[in-house]
Amino acid sequence: MGQRRWNIKKRIMAGFVLVLVAVSAVVALLFRQTENKLRTEYRRLVQRSVESAAHRLDTFIREIYNISDNYAFNNQLDSYLEKEYTEEQVYQRRADVMRMYRNIFETSDILQKREKISGILTAKGVLFNFADVNCDGQEVADRLTALGVNDPDHLMRFYWYPLQDNFMVSDASGDPRRDKAVFGSRRVYSVWKSAYVCAHIFCVQEEDLYEVYRENVVETKGEIYVLDEHGNLLSSSNDECIARGRIDDIFRERILNRTEDDFTWKSGYGKFEVCVRESELSRWLTVAVIPQKNITGEVNALYLRIYVVLILCLLGCVVVLLRMYQGFLPR
C-alpha cells in the first residue's frame, strides 16, 4: 500500500514537472520573440535618433561655414588685416577688436543668436581675440599656430580640432563642458591680393555642441559621442569622457575599423548596441552606444517575475493536491 501511495505521488509530481517545463518553454519562447522584436524596434528608434542628432549638428556647422563665407568677402575687415602693432600698442589693438566686434559682427546679428567668429589670426601674426579681448598674448597666437590654423596644406578648407581646454579665454568656470571647446579654422584667400590674408577661428564650447543633440540622448537611453573623422573626441553626453577629453582607445579602434554602421560590440563591461552615422558635410561621426540591458532589461525582469510566480503557483498546487489525495486514502 505504501509503495502504491509513493508511486501515485511520484506520478503527480512528474505530471506537474512536465506541465511546468511545457509552460516555461512556451513562456520563454514568447518572451524571446518579444525581446527580439523589441530590440529590432529599438534599433530603428536609435537609428532615427542618431540621424536626427547628426542632422542637427550639420545645421549648426553649416551656419558656422556660412558665417565664415560671409566675412571672408567683407571689405570692412581689410583695413584691420593689414595692421601691425608694437608691444606698446596693445590697447590700440584691443580697441580695434572692440570696433570690429561692434561695427561688423554685432550689426549682422541683431538678435545675438548666431555663432560668432572667436578670433582672426592675420598673415602678419596679429591676433584679434573676440572671445576674450584681454586674452590676446603671443602665447595664444602661438598655440593657434601650433594647431595648424595657418597650415598651407589646408588651403581654404575648414578644419576642426579635437576637444581641448579653451585657451582663448582667461577665466575657467570649473565645469568641463564650459572650459573645454572645439576649435575650427579656415584660411581666407584674397582674390584682390592673390594671397592668404588671415585665418578665421571659431571656438565652440562643448556645452553648446551638447545642447544641439541633448534631446536625442534621452531617446536613446544610452550615450552619444561626437567624433572627428580620426576618432578624436569632439563632444559627448558622458561627463567622465568630457573631463578626460578622449574616448577609450579600444572603442576608438572599433569605430574606425567598423565594417557596418550598426553593430553589437562586446567589451569587458558587457554587450552594447552601437549606431554610427557619418556627416558628409564635416566628416564628423555621431555614435550612439546603448547597453543591451537598457533595451531588454524590463522584458527580462518581467519574464523572471512571471517565471518565479509560475513556479510558486505550481508548487502550491502540488502541496494542495497531495493533501487532498491523502485525505481520500483509508487510514
What are these regions (language model features)?
Residues 8-86:
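Juxtamembrane extracytoplasmic/periplasmic/luminal helical "stalk" adjacent to the first N-terminal
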Residues 62-99, 118-133:
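Extracellular/periplasmic ligand-binding regions of membrane signal-transduction receptors
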Residues 98-111, 199-241:
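Solvent-exposed, extracytoplasmic
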Residues 176-190, 268-277, 284-286:
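A short beta-strand signature within small-molecule sensing/ligand-binding domains used
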Residues 226, 285-331:
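Cytoplasm-proximal transmembrane signaling helix
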